[in-house]
């Protein structure tokens, strides 16, 4: 459960995003635990010290009592509002936001065929990384991708801003591309039972 300042706009059984973006140095250090940021390793858009810790959790509301909101499933991340508020780069402390989405979307029993570069080079060009990206699953809950073959694609599928999505019984073949299935800014995504039969360079073999 979380307590919000005003729960009047929230409804039972609706989906919301529990989110934070904060670059308080103490908060960044807590998030990284024993890890350290290597100067120059990432570009400015991915600098956690500048842009802050970003957390997005997607939840369905089970009950609302006053301003206390309880979700159907446990919260994954500690919600600590004691760190100072970060006000730069459009950031914010913990808050609950409405989450427009689609539900019960299934994609199955299909083949997606592309023609990605034979001499793939990681981040070599836009053609290497993304010329053939047939499928994206965005803002979905309780949805799935199964029994699908991806042939010679740059990136098979990205699951973004989604929750409770399953991806399984997937085959990759043909020419090897940039990536297969990835989950980004999502909660509770299962990716399993995938088989890679593609041919081509490995990431560490340019």
Residue ranges: model-predicted function:
Residues 55, 101, 131, 139, ...:
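Exposed loop/turn and edge beta-strand positions of beta-sandwich/beta-sheet ligand-binding modules
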Residues 103-114, 141-152, 163-177, 185-206:
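Right-handed parallel beta-helix
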Residues 84-98, 121-136, 152-155, 174-183, ...:
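Extracellular beta-strand/beta-solenoid scaffold signature
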Residues 1, 7-8, 27-121, 128:
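Small/polar beta-strand repeat architecture
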Residues 156-160:
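Aromatic-lined, polymer-binding surfaces characteristic
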